[in-house]
C-alpha cells in the first residue's frame, strides 16, 4: 500500500445542484459526514497489518451486546451503531477516541463512495441484466421479455452456475469510484460530491480515498 487512505462514514441526504466558478450547473450529492470516532488502531506488531477502525451513528446502549460494550469502553467512547475498518500505512498517527469529520477531505480530491443500493424487488432479465429480449413480432408468442436459452439439452444437461436470470434486484453493497468532491462545508459537516452515489436518502455511505487514479 503506497498512499495513505482517508475515510469517513456518513448519511446520504439527497441531491441538489450548485454553480461552479464558470456559472455552470453541477449536480451534487450532499453527504452528512461524521462525526466519527476512532475505536481501534491496528499495528503490524500486534495485528500483522496497519488499519484504523472508526465508528458512526447513535445507538441505544441497551441494544449493544457485552463484547461491543467492552470494545467501546476500551476506546473511552459512547457506543455507536456502525463500525468500519480502513487499512492505511499511517494508522499509527491516529489515537483512540479521536474525532474524524468531513475536514479529512478537501475539495477537488477523488473519492470512492460505498453504500447499499436501492432494492427493486423481483425483476426480469431485461431490467436486471439489460438483456435485449426477444423480437416484438415475427412469430414470437408471449416470450418477448424472456431470457431465451439458458443452456444446452443433454450436453451439458444442466444450467451453469452464475447464469444471469430473473431474481431480486438491488439492496446490494455498491461502490462508485473516482467521484470528485466539489465542496466541503466543515462548519455543517457536509460533503458535496459531484454526481450520484449509491443508496436511498438517509442511507449509510462510506467515503474514502479513491483506490484508482490520481
UniProtKB/Swiss-Prot annotation:
Q: Which GO terms describe its cellular component?
A: cytosolic large ribosomal subunit
Q: Which GO terms describe its molecular function?
A: rRNA binding; structural constituent of ribosome
**Matching SUPFAM superfamilies:** Translation proteins (SSF50447)
Classification via InterPro entries: Ribosomal_uL3, Ribosomal_uL3_bac/org-type, Ribosomal_uL3_CS, Transl_B-barrel_sf
Pfam families per record:
Ribosomal_L3 (PF00297)
Stretches the record annotates as Disordered:
133-153
Keywords, alphabetical: Ribonucleoprotein, Ribosomal protein, RNA-binding, rRNA-binding
Which family is annotated? Belongs to the universal ribosomal protein uL3 family.
Q: Which PANTHER family does this entry report, sorted A to Z?
A: 50S RIBOSOMAL PROTEIN L3 (PTHR11229), LARGE RIBOSOMAL SUBUNIT PROTEIN UL3C (PTHR11229:SF16)
Q: What does this protein do?
A: One of the primary rRNA binding proteins, it binds directly near the 3'-end of the 23S rRNA, where it nucleates assembly of the 50S subunit.
> What's the subunit arrangement here?
Part of the 50S ribosomal subunit. Forms a cluster with proteins L14 and L19.
Name the record gives this protein: Large ribosomal subunit protein uL3
What is the species of this protein? Streptomyces griseus subsp. griseus (strain JCM 4626 / CBS 651.72 / NBRC 13350 / KCC S-0626 / ISP 5235)
Species classification: Bacteria, Bacillati, Actinomycetota, Actinomycetes, Kitasatosporales
Amino acid at each position: 500500500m503506497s498512499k495513505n487512505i482517508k475515510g469517513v462514514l456518513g448519511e446520504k441526504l439527497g441531491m441538489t445542484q450548485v454553480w461552479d466558478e464558470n456559472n455552470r450547473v453541477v449536480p451534487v450529492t450532499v453527504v452528512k459526514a461524521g462525526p466519527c470516532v476512532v475505536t481501534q488502531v491496528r499495528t503490524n506488531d500486534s495485528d500483522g497489518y496497519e488499519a484504523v477502525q472508526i465508528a458512526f451513528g447513535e445507538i441505544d446502549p441497551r441494544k449493544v451486546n457485552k463484547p461491543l460494550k467492552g470494545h467501546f469502553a476500551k476506546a473511552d467512547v459512547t457506543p455507536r451503531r456502525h463500525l468500519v475498518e480502513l487499512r492505511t500505512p499511517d494508522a499509527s498517527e491516529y489515537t483512540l477516541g479521536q474525532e474524524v469529520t468531513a475536514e479529512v477531505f478537501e475539495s477537488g480530491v477523488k473519492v470512492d463512495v460505498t453504500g447499499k443500493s436501492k432494492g427493486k424487488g423481483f425483476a426480469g432479465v431485461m431490467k436486471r441484466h439489460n438483456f435485449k429480449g426477444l423480437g416484438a413480432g415475427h412469430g414470437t408468442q408471449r416470450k418477448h421479455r424472456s431470457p431465451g436459452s439458458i443452456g444446452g439439452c443433454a450436453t451439458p444437461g444442466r444450467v451453469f452456475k452464475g447464469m444471469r436470470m430473473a431474481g431480486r434486484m438491488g439492496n446490494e453493497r455498491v461502490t462508485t469510484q473516482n467521484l470528485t468532491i466539489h465542496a466541503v462545508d466543515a462548519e455543517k459537516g457536509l460533503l458535496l460530491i459531484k454526481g450520484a452515489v449509491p443508496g436511498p436518502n438517509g442511507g449509510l455511505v462510506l467515503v474514502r480515498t479513491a483506490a484508482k487514479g490520481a
